[in-house]
Amino acid sequence: MKYDTSELCDIYQEDVNVVEPLFSNFGGRASFGGQIITVKCFEDNGLLYDLLEQNGRGRVLVVDGGGSVRRALVDAELTRLAVQNEWEGLVIYGAVRQVDDLEELDIGIQAMAAIPVGAAGEGIGESDVRVNFGGVTFFSGDHLYADNTGIILSEDPLDIE
């Protein structure tokens, strides 16, 4: 499904929170949306592997990487796992790498920057916790919509059709 965050903001202005414009699109989908699962991890993506092995149909993984752009939390291997398990998208408050590969994969990815250095894989972090970045607080179960214009968040699903 295609999402237009500008139109959604016009229709649901009182019902959505708009994430500050810190992110760029690195994935093969220009827009994506779904119910979110939150993760908090710093320069370590081991927990992301565990979560992205789950069925992701209709879901978006929101990762609070502390805004660090020293190490990439997401690479092509991890993204292929997400695609295989039908995740709608990833929002990374941090960095990604292997961007030429990422843009070829059928998934939405919004992240702050790209860097070639990979993250540790020890599995340090927490999931299903409140995370806050970009002027918005994210809770697992909220609904996120993203496109090349921006990212918006709603407690309830928006009537898109």
UniProtKB/Swiss-Prot annotation:
Q: From which domain of life does this come?
A: Bacteria
Q: What is its main location?
A: cytoplasm
The UniProt entry's GO CC annotations, sorted and at most eight, read:
cytosol
Per its UniProt record, what SUPFAM superfamilies does this chain match?
RraA-like (SSF89562)
Pfam families for this protein = RraA-like (PF03737)
Instruction: Tell me where it resides.
Output: Cytoplasm
Q: Which InterPro entries match?
A: RraA, RraA/RraA-like, RraA/RraA-like_sf, RraA_gpbac
Q: Does this UniProt record's set of keywords contain Cytoplasm?
A: yes
- Which Gene Ontology MF annotations are present? endoribonuclease inhibitor activity; enzyme binding
Keyword Cytoplasm among record annotations: yes
UniProtKB keywords: Cytoplasm
Q: Name one GO biological process term.
A: negative regulation of RNA catabolic process
**Signal peptide (from-to):** none
Function of the protein: Globally modulates RNA abundance by binding to RNase E (Rne) and regulating its endonucleolytic activity. Can modulate Rne action in a substrate-dependent manner by altering the composition of the degradosome. Modulates RNA-binding and helicase activities of the degradosome.
Identify its protein family: Belongs to the RraA family.
Q: How does it assemble?
A: Homotrimer. Binds to both RNA-binding sites in the C-terminal region of Rne and to RhlB.
HAMAP family referenced in this protein's UniProt entry, alphabetically: RraA (MF_00471)
Q: What is this protein called?
A: Regulator of ribonuclease activity A
Organism, per UniProt?
A: Escherichia fergusonii (strain ATCC 35469 / DSM 13698 / CCUG 18766 / IAM 14443 / JCM 21226 / LMG 7866 / NBRC 102419 / NCTC 12128 / CDC 0568-73)
